[in-house]
UniProtKB/Swiss-Prot annotation:
The active site is at E117. The record marks F23 as: Substrate discrimination. GO terms for cellular component: cytosol. This is DNA polymerase IV. It comes from Streptococcus gordonii (strain Challis / ATCC 35105 / BCRC 15272 / CH1 / DL1 / V288).
Length: 354
């Protein structure tokens, strides 16, 4: 028996556009000598004493196992021939605005998720084109023809499936998921690839024996709600390709943060501050990607006994600079009373966007 009725609106035409290795692709475009070489956007660990985090990298670097959010030190160990570029984020933002203008030729119902990806609702569009697939192809063509960059596109009847579709074939892919194909498309998929299902939820699902979309289909709705609360309702529908969330052109993000749970508890100040430095870099990357600056830095600490402490500090000027975020996080930590307890989680968030 269903707790909530299944309502599946299959009339919409949603496109998800995701630029391919965006920052790195812009650098290769602007410097053809980089073509064919592994390019890593992030500080060179040979110049920073091993500090820093990879913002993104091109597909040549990914062949060596390099990926975003990896430490620059590990990226260098995996790919010593990689070319490290600190990045020109003002340039990336300018190109992102050019891409946004291309989207606007087709629809005003655009929900940017970051500087390099967005949802578009083209059910009703400016050119009166009935085929969302045709519009997706036109957008890909425009981006390549005008900016010499590639984008992957996913087309479906909701945002959840469009996002999954755009990730399915990269780079420069175009994947379509029709209503009658949704369950079959999702069935063999690793549950960790379901958009919106985080690591903690994946762990819980694995404990339940759920590893794929097909496994999730077998779980009763009430069981999922008992285990996950309201999110169980969403999981039950995701497995069936149901998601009626609208494309919100006025979507407002109020904060950006990163956190990490540690299998081995942190005790030493050196280890704790090292982790805060890495988190600051990741937060900066995310702020740049979303073109945000904030005035308030929030430090979150969860101790071994699962008690949680949250403390914040406001700045005079909004920032997205990793050094400012790192310095403020260290200041907040230093202001705390000495705690002999081990730390199992650290989090850094920037809010108070200008």
């Amino acid at each position: 028996m269903l707790i909530f009725p299944l309502i599946n609106d299959t009339s919409r035409k949603i496109i998800h556009i995701d630029m391919d290795a965006f920052f790195a692709a812009v650098e290769v475009r602007d410097n053809p000598k980089l073509k064919g070489h592994p390019v890593i956007i992030g500080s060179d660990p040979r110049l920073t004493g091993g500090r820093g985090v990879v913002s993104t990298c091109n597909y040549e670097a990914r062949k060596f196992g390099v990926h975003s959010a990896m430490s620059s030190k590990e990226a260098y160990e995996r790919c010593p021939q990689g070319i490290f570029i600190s990045g020109n984020y003002e340039k990336y933002q300018a190109v992102g605005l050019q891409i946004r203008e291309i989207f606007k030729r087709y629809t005003d119902l655009i929900e940017p998720m970051s500087i390099d990806e967005a949802y578009l609702d083209v059910t009703e569009n400016k050119l009166g084109i009935k085929s969302a697939v045709k519009i997706a192809k036109l957008i890909q063509h425009d981006i390549w023809n005008e900016l010499q960059l590639t984008a992957s596109a996913g087309v479906s009847y909701n945002k959840f499936l469009a996002k999954i579709a755009s990730d399915y074939e990269k780079p420069h892919g175009l994947t379509v998921i029709l209503p009658e194909e949704a369950e079959a498309f999702l069935a063999p998929m690793d549950i960790a690839k379901f958009h919106g299902v985080g690591n903690k939820s994946v762990e819980k699902l694995h404990e339940m024996g759920v590893y794929t979309g097909a496994d999730l289909l077998k779980i009763p709705e009430m069981t999922l709600i008992d285990k996950f609360g309201r999110f169980g309702f969403d999981l039950y529908r995701k497995a069936r390709g149901i998601s009626n969330s609208p494309v919100k052109s006025n979507r407002i993000r109020k904060s950006i943060g990163k956190e990490r749970t540690y299998a081995k508890l942190l005790y030493s100040e050196e280890d704790i501050k090292k982790e805060l430095t890495l988190l600051a870099q990741k937060v900066e990357n995310s702020l740049i990607k979303h073109d945000k600056k904030g005035r308030t830095i929030v430090l979150k600490i969860r101790y071994a006994d699962f008690s949680t402490l949250t403390k914040r500090k406001s700045l005079n000027l909004a920032t997205r600079d990793k050094k400012q975020i790192e310095r403020t996080a260290h200041e907040i930590y230093d202001s705390l009373e000495e705690q002999p307890r081990g730390i199992r989680l650290l989090g850094l968030t920037v809010t108070g966007f200008e």
